[in-house]
Curated annotation (Swiss-Prot):
Main location: cytoplasm
UniProt-recorded name of the protein: Phosphatidylinositol-3,5-bisphosphate 3-phosphatase MTMR6
Organism per entry: Homo sapiens
Protein family membership: Belongs to the protein-tyrosine phosphatase family. Non-receptor class myotubularin subfamily.
EC number: 3.1.3.95
InterPro entries: MTMR6_PH-GRAM, Myotubularin, Myotubularin-like_Pase_dom, PH-like_dom_sf, Prot-tyrosine_phosphatase-like, Tyr_Pase_AS, Tyr_Pase_cat
Keywords annotated in UniProt: Cell membrane, Cell projection, Cytoplasm, Endocytosis, Endoplasmic reticulum, Hydrolase, Lipid metabolism, Membrane, Phosphoprotein
Region (Interaction with RAB1B): 2-141
Subcellular location(s) of the protein: Cytoplasm; Endoplasmic reticulum-Golgi intermediate compartment; Endoplasmic reticulum; Cell projection, Ruffle membrane
Function, in words: Binds with high affinity to phosphatidylinositol 3,5-bisphosphate (PtdIns(3,5)P2) but also to phosphatidylinositol 3-phosphate (PtdIns(3)P), phosphatidylinositol 4-phosphate (PtdIns(4)P), and phosphatidylinositol 5-phosphate (PtdIns(5)P), phosphatidic acid and phosphatidylserine. Negatively regulates ER-Golgi protein transport.
């Protein structure tokens, strides 16, 4: 609380950034240790978690007061007008301090207390067991074994303790290969396809320069190739543009020389680096925040940002990986520069295409734990959790979630979860409310003792999983064993519910998704009514001589049925049930639930030119 000088300011205006008439709400602004809270004159609450704040800007004083603009990592933008400049200055300075902490222990997760005892906390962390996940895949087996070479993090600090490697790969080969790979990230197993006996492996770029080679690294790749009894050649996927990889050779890094590695086929897939992605997102947000933009100008700005082209590049890479396994029975080794950004994107998306388990709520959690958290995606740096280098911030994980959303749009019956689940996860990679995404690797998390001092997100999501269920999900999802998405440009849409989730006055529309949810609820209520009626009929059958159920009897069964009275077309829709539990998890009030009104349709085909009123923008190339 030492950073808070002013805790309450009255007569503050909250502007609607898309209103052409500068509409505003007047209320009171509160500053707490964890949140910024605005309560308007109608008692509607707007909660902003300090860790969600990406930037704070105090504009020049105007006749109506001092403007304060807050940009958030979850794409909320708020524009306050504070009556007194001194109060605005105090709030501004406080938010600068509270939104950028210097050490992990000051983050929200270390003070958040959901009133669970130590046993319940531990059970929450034990919910995801990666050893069980590898057993589900079918490893260890005659070709792959669990290695203890990195048990003490001596070979690679950013890898997990337990790693799966080819059975014929000895420890000297592993150690030698690690010395030839950037950050010591040598090739290890990420996913094993039992039916094809093929593997997805991951690593970082080799330190090959223009001519260097390493026999141990060559032997390890050969061991991966031999671990596939069906196909002896393997693909090496470099996820970078070829020019970038060639430029790294000048720095003593680069990519594998095919002359030195037997039975490999090399493939560049051209996903840009974190700096290009950060710039692209910034351009997208600038377009989104422009008031009074025409449809043509919005489309032009969206295309100029390049954002959807980058999403397509990630998706195409995952499709190539999946086809290499399913069509050619080939194992694939994936790497980028350091093996924790683009590599995580491609390995996780490829696994999602191949394995329907990862398309369930629990399976998706396992996938994130496996390919992102355990293998050292730098969540702390990429999400700007601490006051560090802004050039290390990049929306790598956001792109992954967006790719998954596009898959749910193309295959609405194949996923157990709805987009609300993806949005909730995105909320918490930035909230710092739970320990899962804190830190940059497992070793760092163990040193922070996160399992003893913080709580896991996953049990909270599972407890409320009914909120995230996809009503279109087919229990016979085995029909979608392998997903084969179509990546023609016009299949990529602007994800309105991600980037405009808080802009409630921007082209409101009724959600087909919400209609389906309410239809399900109505069907359940009708089924209950039928059972009640049958029970009443059975009880009164001796009294009913003509076999006709009277109006009085119907009324006695269900006298007040709002579901039967309310027309579906005019009923207010809500993507997620609004309750206090949701507020606890999100750090936002029920009345400000941004998921309402904006869900996209799952399977409706749309014309090539679509009004922004429908929340869809197509990419054109």
């Amino acid at each position: 609380m030492e950073h808070i000088r002013t805790t309450k300011v009255e007569q503050v205006k909250l502007l609607d950034r898309f209103s052409t008439s500068n509409k505003s709400l007047t209320g009171t602004l509160y500053l707490t240790a964890t949140h910024l809270l605005f309560i308007d004159s109608h008692q509607k609450e707007t909660w902003i978690l300090h860790h969600h704040i990406a930037s704070v800007e105090k504009l020049a004083l105007t006749t109506s007061g001092c403007p304060l603009v807050i940009q958030c990592k979850n794409f909320r933008t708020v524009h306050f007008i504070v009556p007194r400049e001194r109060d605005c200055h105090d709030i501004y300075n406080s938010l600068l301090q509270l939104s950028k902490q210097a050490k992990y222990e000051d983050l929200y997760a270390f003070s958040y207390n959901p009133k669970q005892n130590d046993s319940e906390r531990l059970q929450g962390w034990q919910l995801i067991d990666l050893a069980e996940e590898y057993k589900r895949m079918g490893v260890p087996n005659s070709h792959w074994q669990l290695s203890d070479a990195n048990r003490d993090y001596k070979i690679c600090e950013t890898y997990p303790r337990e790693l799966y490697v080819p059975r014929i790969a000895s420890k000297p080969i592993i150690v030698g290969s690690s010395k030839f790979r950037s950050k010591g990230r040598f090739p290890v197993l990420s996913y094993y396809h039992q039916d094809k006996e093929a593997a997805i492996c991951r690593c970082s770029q080799p330190l090959s320069g223009f001519s260097a080679r390493c026999l141990e690294d060559e032997h390890l790749l050969q061991a991966i190739s031999k671990a596939n009894p069906v196909n002896r050649y393997m693909y090496v996927m470099d996820t970078r543009p070829k020019l970038n990889a060639m430029a790294n050779r000048a720095a003593g890094k680069g990519y594998e020389n095919e002359d030195n590695y037997s039975n490999i086929r090399f493939q560049f897939v051209g996903i840009e680096n974190i700096h290009v992605m950060r710039s692209s997102l910034q351009k997208l947000l600038e377009v989104n925040g422009t008031k009074g933009l025409s449809v043509n100008d919005f489309y032009s700005g969206l295309e100029s940002s390049g954002w959807l082209r980058h999403i397509k590049a990630v998706m195409d890479a995952a499709i190539f990986l999946a086809k290499a396994i399913t069509v050619e029975n080939a194992s694939v080794l994936v790497h980028c520069s350091d093996g924790w950004d683009r590599t995580s994107q491609v390995c996780s998306l490829g696994s999602l295409l191949l394995d329907s388990y990862y398309r369930t709520i629990k399976g998706f959690m396992v996938l994130i734990e496996k390919d992102w958290i355990s293998f050292g995606h730098k969540f702390s740096e990429r999400c700007g959790q601490l006051d560090g280098d802004p050039k290390e911030v990049s929306p790598v994980f956001t792109q992954f979630l967006e790719c998954v959303w596009h898959l749910t749009e193309q295959f609405p019956q194949a996923f157990e979860f709805s987009e609300a689940f993806l949005l909730q996860i995105h909320e918490h990679i930035h909230s710092c409310q739970f320990g899962n995404f804190l830190g940059n690797c497992q070793k760092e998390r163990e040193e922070l003792k996160l399992k003893e001092k913080t709580y896991s997100l996953w049990p909270f999501l599972l407890e409320d999983q009914k909120k995230y269920l996809n009503p279109l999900y087919s229990s016979e999802s085995h029909r979608f064993t392998v997903l084969e998405p179509n990546t023609v440009s016009f299949n990529f849409k602007f994800w309105r519910n991600m980037y405009h989730q808080f802009d409630r006055t921007l082209h409101p529309r009724q959600s087909v998704f919400n209609i389906i949810m309410n239809m399900n609820e109505q069907n359940k209520q009708l089924e209950k009514d039928i059972k009640d009626l049958e029970s009443k009929i059975k009880q009164r059958k001796n009294k009913q001589t003509d076999g006709i159920l009277t109006k009085e009897l119907l009324h006695s069964v269900h006298p007040e049925s709002p579901n039967l009275k309310t027309s579906l077309c005019f009923k207010e829709q809500t993507l997620l049930p609004v309750n206090d539990a949701l507020r606890t998890i999100e750090g936002s009030s029920p009345a400000d639930n941004r998921y309402s009104e904006y869900a996209e349709e799952f399977s409706k085909s749309e014309p090539a030119v679509v009004s922004l009123e429908y929340g869809v923008a197509r990419m054109t190339c």
